[in-house]
Structures are given as structure tokens and as C-alpha cells.
Amino acid sequence: MIMSLGPYASFIVTSYAAAALVVAILIGWIATDYRSQTRRLRDLDRSGITRRSGRSAMDRP
């Protein structure tokens, strides 16, 4: 199936390619940041620092 995009074909194809590239970069950035945050939380848990959500009401000052 071949589509005729007319005289604006290069603009349309370039726009879709740019949008796809931006989405791919954002997905990569989010995946990298997720791994980084998970690693930081694991390191903090190992060092003994607990999360606020893990504390009970009696632990608060």
C-alpha cells in the first residue's frame, strides 16, 4: 500500500520521524532515571535510612 502524500511529503515524514525520535528519547530517559532512582533507594535502605512510609505513628518525634 503506497500513499501519495503530495508536495508536503518530506515535511510530513520528517515531522513523524522527529516525533518518534523525541518519544524514543523520552522513553530511554525515563528508563535510565528509574534505574538510577531504584539504585539510590536500595543504597539508602542498605545504609539504614528508612522511608517515611515505613515508619509507624509511634516512631515520630
UniProtKB/Swiss-Prot annotation:
Pfam name, any one: CcmD
GO cellular component, one term: plasma membrane
Membrane topology of this protein: Single-pass membrane protein
An annotated GO BP: cytochrome complex assembly
Keywords associated with the record: Cell inner membrane, Cell membrane, Cytochrome c-type biogenesis, Membrane, Transmembrane, Transmembrane helix, Transport
Principal subcellular localisation of the protein: membrane
Domain of life assignment: Bacteria
Residue intervals passing through the bilayer: 11-31
Subcellular location: Cell inner membrane
Physiological role: Required for the export of heme to the periplasm for the biogenesis of c-type cytochromes.
Protein family (similarity comment): Belongs to the CcmD/CycX/HelD family.
Identification of the protein by name: Heme exporter protein D
Species per Swiss-Prot/TrEMBL record: Bradyrhizobium diazoefficiens (strain JCM 10833 / BCRC 13528 / IAM 13628 / NBRC 14792 / USDA 110)
Gene of this entry: cycX
